């Protein structure tokens, strides 16, 4: 089951850069950055939420970091992201959103990968799947996620949660580049992402339909 709010656009396909550490996105250029791959504490209790808070300064947000959170700068702001239970505490920051995660796969240990992307409209990710639950938040622009069941369209400020093991391809849609975050909470004994051949894209519901 997937959770989302939707819109629609047509796109043309061009493959976006791979997500890597310290990509050009970190310098305000086109790219997809792995912000951090962080082991999570073993005492987290489901249901879990992805909490996103915005801060005015790097000093303030770094002071609010705990074992299940990270702090970083992206898209003109400072951000704190955490995986924890539902809470009213935003640690001195401005609350942006919280996203309830779907049940995690059974595992002895979990890790969290946080990704930040700045991608032109019409570009697509590679076809892939994850060994855990993925959540998206659109900072600006629009994006669409193609899966075997349907295509999920998202606008600025919207979120989406995807179960473990769903084959997908992400498409930047709309009239301007997409700026977006993703968090993957996954089985730490496995790679977070498995890429698949682009020929498998034909098995997914197109964002152009």
Please give the residue ranges for each predicted region.
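Jelly-roll (double-stranded beta-helix
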Residues: 3, 7-135, 142-209
């Amino acid at each position: 089951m997937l959770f989302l709010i939707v819109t629609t656009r047509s796109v043309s396909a061009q493959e976006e850069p791979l997500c890597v550490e310290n990509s050009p996105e970190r310098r305000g250029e086109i790219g997809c950055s792995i912000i951090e791959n962080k082991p999570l504490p073993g005492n987290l209790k489901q249901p879990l939420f992805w909490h996103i808070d915005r801060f005015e300064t790097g000093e303030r947000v770094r002071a609010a970091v705990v074992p299940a959170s990270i702090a970083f700068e992206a898209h003109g702001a400072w951000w704190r992201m955490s995986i924890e239970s539902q809470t009213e505490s935003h640690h001195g920051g401005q609350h942006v959103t919280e996203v309830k995660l779907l049940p995690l796969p059974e595992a002895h240990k979990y890790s969290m990968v946080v990704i930040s992307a700045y991608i032109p409209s019409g570009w697509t990710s590679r076809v892939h799947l994850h060994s855990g639950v993925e959540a998206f938040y659109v900072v600006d622009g629009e994006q669409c996620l193609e899966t075997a069941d349907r295509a999920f369209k998202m606008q600025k400020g919207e979120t989406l949660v995807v179960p473990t093991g769903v084959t997908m391809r992400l498409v930047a849609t709309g009239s301007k580049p997409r700026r977006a975050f993703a968090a993957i909470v996954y089985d730490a004994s496995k790679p977070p992402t498995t890429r698949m051949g682009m020929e498998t894209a034909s098995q997914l519901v197109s964002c152009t339909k």
